[in-house]
Design a protein with these regions (language model features):
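Juxtamembrane intracellular "pre-TM" segments in multi-pass secondary transporters
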Residues: 1-4, 186-218
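Cytoplasmic helix-loop-helix junction between adjacent transmembrane helices
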Residues: 105-144
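Residue-level signature of mid-helix packing/kink "hotspots" within the transmembrane helices
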Residues: 56-64, 114, 147-148
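Symmetry-related core transmembrane helices of the 12-TM Major Facilitator Superfamily/SLC fold
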Residues: 166-183
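Extracellular/periplasmic helix-loop-helix junction of adjacent transmembrane segments
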Residues: 31-59
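Hydrophobic core of transmembrane alpha-helices in multi-pass small-molecule transporters
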Residues: 16, 89, 100-114, 221
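Conserved MFS/SLC helix-loop-helix module at the cytosolic interface between two early adjacent transmembrane helices
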Residues: 60-97
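Pair of pore-lining "gating" transmembrane helices in MFS-fold secondary transporters
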Residues: 4-35, 212-229
């Protein structure tokens, strides 16, 4: 098998595992706060909102930093850092005894997140130009499959073996993804020389559809708010 194809197929497994691990938390997080002593539905929703929002807020803030590191050091190291970091965070979640501890761990999880975005750039750079669309399409399907199956199986796992044991199991799964990435994913990375930072005006000149991209980002932001706002409250409802 060609090296780039092996990288694509292994990436599909890793992306599915990490997407599953991230999304499975949605239906059980409010119930976990209840186990930690949060009793009223309003308080459960509040703590769940804090824990959920904390992760994605930090992701938004640190994503440019990790992107810069990936440009300097390569994408594979980002995959390894993210998968093992999220694995450790899930393991730590299983041993929390206070709501504040859960929120802190979720903040840390936001710091180490970024597996899927790094995989996109890795596959785009490693795949032949004529097969890039095919590879990225498969990657998006794996990410979507993990995101859809995660809440379904997450609730079942928590009901079967308990919430804390579910966190441990998911942590092991993410660690497995990191192990696969470490051993089997290959990257032909060549460090790029330092380039001049572009101002917004110069960036607009180089990107013909700059305004359309900005509009798309705003629309995606609004869409994410609409979707994610339901996660902390749907289980309580």
């Amino acid at each position: 098998m060609e090296t780039w194809k092996r990288t694509v197929y292994i990436s599909l497994i890793c992306v599915f595992c990490t997407s599953f691990g991230v999304s499975q938390l949605a239906p059980i997080l409010p119930l976990y706060f209840h186990d930690l002593g949060v009793q009223t539905p309003s308080a459960m929703s509040l703590w769940s909102g804090l824990a959920t929002g904390a992760t994605y807020l930090i992701v938004c803030l640190v994503a440019p930093f990790w992107g810069r590191i990936a440009d300097k050091k390569g994408r594979k190291i980002t995959l390894i850092r993210s998968s093992f970091g999220m694995a450790l965070c899930n393991l730590l979640l299983a041993f929390q005894t206070t709501p504040e501890g859960v929120v802190i761990i979720r903040l840390i999880q936001g710091l180490v997140n970024g597996f899927y975005s790094a995989t996109i750039t890795l596959i785009a750079s490693e795949s032949p130009i004529e097969r890039t669309g095919w590879a990225l399409g498969l990657l998006a399907s794996a990410n979507l499959a993990g995101s859809l199956i995660g809440p379904l199986l997450g609730g079942y796992i928590a009901d079967t073996i308990g919430i804390r044991n579910g966190f441990i199991l998911v942590g092991i799964l993410m660690g497995f993804a990191g192990l696969l990435a470490t051993i089997f994913i290959h990257e032909n990375y060549v460090p790029k020389p330092n380039v001049e930072k572009l101002s917004i005006s110069k960036l607009k000149e180089q990107i013909p559809e700059f305004n359309s991209i900005v509009a798309l980002c705003i629309a995606s932001f609004i869409y994410a708010i609409c979707i994610m706002s339901l996660q902390p409250v749907i289980s309580v409802y």
